[in-house]
């Protein structure tokens, strides 16, 4: 409100200037404002009225200085000594006031007064007429009548008082009397307010949130002001609501506010009476009081509750008047003190958007009204369009009453549910509460989405509170209005209609078509007819409602008494079929069957008006009656025949009245339909979070099913007597979910949720139902997929009911009749009794066991998330595997738990249903959402105890049939029993193609994959088995854990906003692979920290089983979130430290593992790499894992790899992942990559593991090497057929695998090595443990990688080392190679090139110094100190000092890197090393120059990359060490590897190689010389020289390269080229030589992937091949150089090679080999002997093994001749490992730059050239070599081996290695 209005009231002229009047009074100047001209400022003198002594204030008034007249008055107030400031400016005679700047005349004089101008006699009437509207405007604007109006009438009788309320704390109030002192200016007032309230007041707001920004506004504003500091305004009512107390301002406030009780009321009353039409602004005392808090949401004043009483006049009137004349009732009362007070009742009809906002306010304000709890006359309330949505979960605020949209034709009284909630009566004193009801806990309100059709919304609020314990059965009273008023949308029960003003909840189903209105789902009543439901449906509904056990009453009672009344509350439908009218009877007589006590209680309660509101308006149909129900004896086993209903009817019903049971199952179904006041239309799926609200199964007779045309065939009678007993117990569970059980859901089990053997014949509706409502019928027609209201109800009840047990039952859905397919694969309702979980509130919440229809293994879903029935895609792809009913087993059908953040069903379904989309989200401000989100975070962390399969399996499995009633009997026990998946069931589960789940939702739709023929029972079994046995409960684990009853809608909102939804384009921009890697690395580090803090311990369960961290549901959920955010990142799987991985849990959750990252577009990110299109299916594969395997992951080692995922290799990968101990790295790195298996599997993310491995790798590698060596020695690997090289390689592989896996503890690392070997072998696991011989036979290698993974996963921890001896040599080699290479690459990547670091630090130093200079210059300029010599001196000294410090720190950092790089190799004094290095470098250069002449293949030169280069290459390639890039399938074949490498290597080589240009030039010459046809010998001689150097870095690669002579001989500088050649040439050779070409390519690929490419080595080794072939063959170096040597030996060139190679080199090589032999048993045995040609062959084989192990190491070597490559790989592996362990690959690599080379030479030379001057160094390396030989653990052994091999093989001196 601006000052003008205020002035207007006081001065007639200002308010609405009437030209005629003003013209008469005001000078003409005022009427001709100059708009176009720039007028000069007006010099005006302002005098003080009544003070002739005042000299006056002269101001220059101009539009620029004073924008408004109000600002001018503020200025005058500061200058004039007026007690209340300047409130009016008049002409000198005071005849009329001024209200506009234009009215001022230049040079004029005006009088200023602190009073409003007196009203002229001419205008009194006009003023009075106008004042009401003005008052109204102000009241609406400011929240209160403008006090000035009264002053204008009364004159300044008394000083004005203002009530100051502290922002956010309405209890702190102070009254201030305005005086001249505190109103001189706004600042003075703020100071006074600060003094009173005792905190700094910076801002003042009206109660409506309008900021008071000027003194005039303050003076003219309302009498109650909110004082705030710098924080934002907070609505008073919200604060009050939270406190659940009505606004109680001080009595002063009440009196000060007109319209409140107190003397002031008279005036307002008098005036209002004068304005009999209610036109005068009149605020009822309640409205006045509410004014303080009623504007929480402000803009629309009509907040429910006290504010509502505000007269319409107080609100701006929208185009259509909100209030009709006859909608206002007034009462004038005489107060005890003699004052008058007025009560006005106004019935508002909000139009358009106001309805939504109003409903929000009503919900918020309902707290006050709730306290009153008085039922509002439904007729009064009926007009309100707003319908209250329960809290996010459909939990209604106890006191809050939702407004249902009201159809004029329907006099729809609010349901009993409405009654249950205090009726919304704006006139009722908020403080008064109806007897018997205490203030109810506050609940969140959600706005129902208005349906497009004029659906009548009824309040569906279920008020669970307030029922006495005696009200055990709220079962709708038998006296349902059988006569439903056809005309009324909501028929009233005759007795309840007027007497209680509430409908009986029971009758509500029929009477209100409550299902229609309540569900809000298919609100279109027109479809069903006047009643909105077909008569049959109505009757059924009635019967159900009648029969429905007053579960609510129990819940209520439990809430009130905290205990459940099970038996009584369970009403059993006793009506015999005859009794039940199959369709037409409006009411099923079942009500009579209800236990009398229930009926009586209910009836009484319903009759009681006070109780009426208690009864939830939604019929809670809980048919306690179960045919075998042992509960109440009266229950008849006879099931009521279900009335036949047309599919259309079903749909309509489903749509219209989801809560009501459309068809009574012939067997009475124990279920409660709790229609929470959630409109199904509401797309805001709160039910998602509620545990399966529809956790109940509705056993439906075949007849019932038959009755529904929708069901393709009659279902076997669902009634199973045994189920009945359980049902009664189950009924206790608060399945508040309003089940639209209307669909016949025949569950033979009467158990509430336990599905009886017979399938529920639920028509699967196309629309996805929120899992929350178990309604069999997904309301396909209903656009709202989730009936969140229903779920919400469940939560409400669950929250309130102490019952520990909650079942989440997925009702089978029979396809709609309209769907010809009508697959019977109903989501078989599987009673999934969630283990009793204590909700934080102590109330048990039904955990949602979310079922994925996909049949995939259960995805872990927190209970908060509702299970979405992953209905088949809109196609209702549910396989029409006969309903399990055919099987007759009562076992629950596969319960697919789907974790759907927003009740995500299949995406299609959600779209059809209108899933949670931003558009469907509740109408709330972001601030509100965030606030709610934060508010819902439990004060104390909720212990998320995820029960694993073991626990879940507690439920006895009754056989393939599945869990029986017994399982249900134990409420705490999950009903799911491990079931053996029927044959093919497992295959059936995974429906990769069928499942389309977004990353956020693991829910899978049954895909066509499921065998349609398979009985639903089988399918159920399979899922149950898979899910249960595998730990479906693990998936459930999340759901099983008790979550706070409040699963915040805000959480769903956030998920909906983050996830890609139908309503909007991709959720988040996809990040580049680089960024994704960074993010994933950061996320991995974050998770690792959490793990170290034992954040995931609880979810891992008992520590008896060692399970990896990723098994933790929390961990998986976190990863899933990260993956969802950054789908491009592959680092997720393995980023945790091994130490973190050594965690225990019952089993890993499949769901997360199964989750396939998808891009924002929905494309499976990993599918490209996965190779199989299935990988695109997010969870199908993983979910299909066999449960039994899941249960005993450690015991599964031998289980057939394909058992779970037959036909789904991807699944295998996941399954591997799932088993905690499975070797992920090796399997995933080697096999998965090769297979294109998902990288997603935990094992598949070597990067993560690599990171952790890198951190722990060095220490672990040493330890592991030692252990491996010992074991290998014990095993006498040679005896077992594994050459020593193989042993070392294996150990390396193990280390590498561990690093790749990055998912294991150190133990895991060791085991992964074994597993990796197994994967690489793809044959069987061959642990390196020397104690046991390999259990797996080579045939296993031939088995699919998935099998290997499984085996690995099964016993990798235990059998890993033991089975090493027996691994297939080839598999061993490959796995080892991959693992080692991955490890090497990772480790190499850890330490950057010292030269690069040095340059970078220097750049930083320069930049900093420049910045410092700039800063000092700026300082000089600022303080004008340019000529200050002292300052100059200070600055100079500072710069010098800083420069010295920076340089010193730079040197230190470089030294650190160098020292880390040189760890593995003892380095001699730097000076000696440098000299040696320089000599060697010169020699090498000379040799290289000559190489061109000797090069066997002049033109070709493989890129020679040092180990360091490998990681760099890897980075450049974007591949992750240990894992194939997600985008590219990993193909083990050489050709693919070549393709991948060729393009990458050049880049990588260029990037990686730091060789001097001279070297590169030399290398080119060498290549040319080779092309020229130089003899291999010459080339090899040169190569050895270079190789010596290279080998130190990439000895392995060099050796391999030597084998490949052609390109291998190329100098390192050409590493890129050499590498390319190697790939082209070496690969074939390797294949030929090794005989395992694929393996070699795999190794190469692995090497590439690992990022360790020993290209340079390969090149050198190629050259060496000719020269050193014999030597290599003989030399133990073959492990590294061995392969190369062997090949040359075969070629017979080795002897020549040796001869031609410089004697120094040979000596060095020999010495190194000797050292190796001494150091490493396998090296000595194999390589030393390898010198002989025959031994070369053996070495070749060994090399092969080594190569496999080496994969991580030299990949290019694989391409080299197989034997040569293999041995080379082995050696390179060793070297790499050595470098990895101690040196970064960069170190081994010998920095490209001379300096780096020198450094590397220093580091490497000792090992590489034992015989040479570096022999000193060699000596230390020798000891290391033995370690390597023994353990050949990834780190030290590899590097040492590499170094040695490099020296020996190269035959070069250290010079060769050093640059």
Curated annotation (Swiss-Prot):
Question: Which Pfam families does the annotation name?
Answer: DCX
Q: Where is the Doublecortin domain?
A: 42-126, 160-239
The yes or no answer to whether the keyword Metal-binding is present is: no
Tell me the domain of life: Eukaryota
Q: Where is the composition biased (Polar residues)?
A: 130-139, 499-512, 535-551, 734-750, 1241-1252, 1336-1345, 1567-1577, 1756-1778
Please name the GO terms of the biological process aspect recorded for this protein, alphabetically.
cell projection organization; intracellular signal transduction; photoreceptor cell development; photoreceptor cell maintenance; visual perception
Q: Where is the composition biased (Low complexity)?
A: 716-728, 870-883
Its annotated compartments are: Cytoplasm, Cytoskeleton, Cilium axoneme; Cell projection, Cilium, Photoreceptor outer segment
Q: Cellular component per GO?
A: axoneme; photoreceptor connecting cilium; photoreceptor outer segment
Stretch list, region Disordered? 1-22, 115-154, 263-301, 426-445, 457-593, 700-750, 868-920, 952-997, 1152-1211, 1227-1255, 1298-1350, 1567-1859
Q: What happens when the gene is disrupted?
A: Mice display scattered outer segment disorganization, reduced electroretinogram amplitudes, and progressive photoreceptor degeneration. In single rods defective cells photosensitivity is reduced. Rp1 and Rp1l1 double heterozygotes exhibits abnormal outer segment morphology and reduced single rod photosensitivity and dark currents, while individual heterozygotes are normal.
Q: Which tissues express it?
A: Retinal-specific; expressed in photoreceptor.
Question: Mind telling me which InterPro entries this protein's record contains?
Answer: Doublecortin_dom (IPR003533), Doublecortin_dom_sf (IPR036572)
Question: Its quaternary structure?
Answer: Interacts with RP1; has a synergistic effect with RP1 in photoreceptor differentiation.
Protein function: Required for the differentiation of photoreceptor cells. Plays a role in the organization of outer segment of rod and cone photoreceptors.
In Swiss-Prot or TrEMBL terms, this protein is called Retinitis pigmentosa 1-like 1 protein
Q: Which organism is it from?
A: Mus musculus (Mouse)
